[in-house]
């Protein structure tokens, strides 16, 4: 019940997953992952399937939990907003060689990664989705 309260689900202890929203299911999964007070929390595309507002809220929740519980966060994601909001250290893997091509802070890598593909990927974050005149 305490872990559910941490993720904003106090009062939903008796609900089934089908009875709550997608964002609430993600938060319930996070509470379940925290049940044994791990030192490391692993996330695999945590905001997949969420709308941008719910994704941002989940990012904020992950940061709050990291800070309050002192847990290390390891996350696999393609969501640029999440990378820049949560990450203080990133590792990029080459899809062909399966080797690390860059690692460091995402803002620094966006500017100066040796691998141009890493720079291009991270710079998409600053590119508007709709071009204006």
PLM features: residue spans?
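Conserved ABC ATPase "signature" region
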Residues: 1-12
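Conserved ABC ATPase signature
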Residues: 16-20, 24
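A short, proline-enriched helix->beta-strand linker immediately N-terminal to the Walker B motif
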Residues: 35-39
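Catalytic Walker B motif of ABC-type/P-loop ATPase nucleotide-binding domains
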Residues: 41-44
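Helix N-cap at the start of a conserved alpha-helix in ABC-type nucleotide-binding domains
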Residues: 52-54
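Helical segment within the ABC ATPase nucleotide-binding domain
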Residues: 56-68
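Conserved beta-strand-loop-alpha-helix hinge in the C-terminal portion
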Residues: 96-122
């Amino acid at each position: 019940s305490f872990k559910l309260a941490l993720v904003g689900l106090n009062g939903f202890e008796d609900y089934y997953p089908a009875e709550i929203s997608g964002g609430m299911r993600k938060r319930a999964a996070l509470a379940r992952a925290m049940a044994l007070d791990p030192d490391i929390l692993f996330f695999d595309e945590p905001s997949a399937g969420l709308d941008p507002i719910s994704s941002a809220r989940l990012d904020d929740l992950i940061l709050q939990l990291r800070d309050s519980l002192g847990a290390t966060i390891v996350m696999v994601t393609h969501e640029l907003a999440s990378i820049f909001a949560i990450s203080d250290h990133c590792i990029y893997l080459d899809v062909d060689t399966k080797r690390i091509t860059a690692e460091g802070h995402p803002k620094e890598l966006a500017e100066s990664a040796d691998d141009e593909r890493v720079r291009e990927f991270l710079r998409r974050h600053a590119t508007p989705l709709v071009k204006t005149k």
